[in-house]
């Protein structure tokens, strides 16, 4: 927190520690974190409840499933059991991989922990065209980039003037602006139900 106060911390790192520091059990430290690293604002323009408060909320998985496919726009980039678009990781079994706290952190701060092979790259072509997305595949001669709209774009490597990996996730970091705290709780509750099918 001292580094934050002195403005000596990278924005990506600050985002990564915001939720954990707001959730610490020591009141003085949590209050200081709330001042220096406030939680994002929700769809009703109110500060989001603390992570501890969100974890205590009861979610409705059925409503969460509807939100996942509509208002939350999650299905625009994630596949669940064959439904949705494959831009980000497949979430069909995410409930067996992440607990509720980690799910909240992944939604609120997607850049804090980007899954391997889902790093965002910015590609600048010699024509001046700029394309941002995830590397879908590459050969010695060609590179295929999948953009946030799930469209694939393939270029000859000889056309690429510059390519840089970004520290920012392609996933929007402001989903809480379209989801209320209860909506978030519902989506997380739905995600916890996504587990491998019994054999």
Question: Where in the sequence are the language-model features?
Answer:
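Post-cleavage N-terminal segment of exported redox proteins
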Residues: 1-59, 80, 190-199
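Feature representing long, continuous alpha-helical segments
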Residues: 31, 62, 72-75, 85, ...
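Small beta-barrel nucleic-acid-binding modules, principally OB-folds
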Residues: 31-53, 102-125
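C-terminal capping alpha-helices of c-type cytochrome domains
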Residues: 32, 36-40, 129-131, 135-141, ...
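Surface beta-strand/loop "capping" patches
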Residues: 54, 59-60, 65, 112-131, ...
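Sequence/structural segment immediately N-terminal to covalent heme-attachment motifs in c-type
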Residues: 58-80
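Sec/Tat-exported extracytoplasmic proteins
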Residues: 71-72, 78, 107-111, 179, ...
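Gly/Gly-Pro-rich "capping" loops immediately C-terminal to redox-active cysteine motifs
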Residues: 83-108, 121-165
């Amino acid at each position: 927190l001292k580094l934050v106060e002195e403005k000596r911390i990278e924005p990506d790192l600050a985002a990564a520690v915001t939720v954990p520091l707001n959730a610490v059990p020591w009141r003085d430290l949590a209050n200081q974190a709330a001042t220096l690293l406030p939680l994002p604002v929700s769809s009703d323009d109110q500060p989001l409840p603390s992570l501890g408060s969100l974890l205590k909320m009861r979610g409705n998985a059925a409503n969460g499933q509807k939100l996942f496919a509509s208002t939350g726009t999650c299905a625009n980039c994630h596949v669940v059991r064959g439904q949705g678009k494959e831009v980000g990781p497949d979430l069909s079994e995410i409930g067996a991989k992440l607990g509720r706290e980690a799910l909240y952190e992944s939604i609120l701060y997607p850049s804090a922990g980007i899954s391997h092979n889902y790093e965002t790259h910015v590609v600048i072509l010699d024509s001046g065209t700029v394309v941002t997305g995830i590397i879908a595949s590459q050969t010695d001669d060609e590179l295929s980039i999948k953009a946030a709209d799930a469209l694939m774009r393939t270029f000859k490597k000889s056309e690429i003037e510059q390519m840089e990996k970004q520290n920012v996730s392609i996933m929007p970091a402001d989903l809480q602006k379209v989801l209320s705290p209860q909506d978030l709780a519902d989506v997380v509750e739905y995600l916890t139900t996504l587990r491998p099918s019994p054999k």
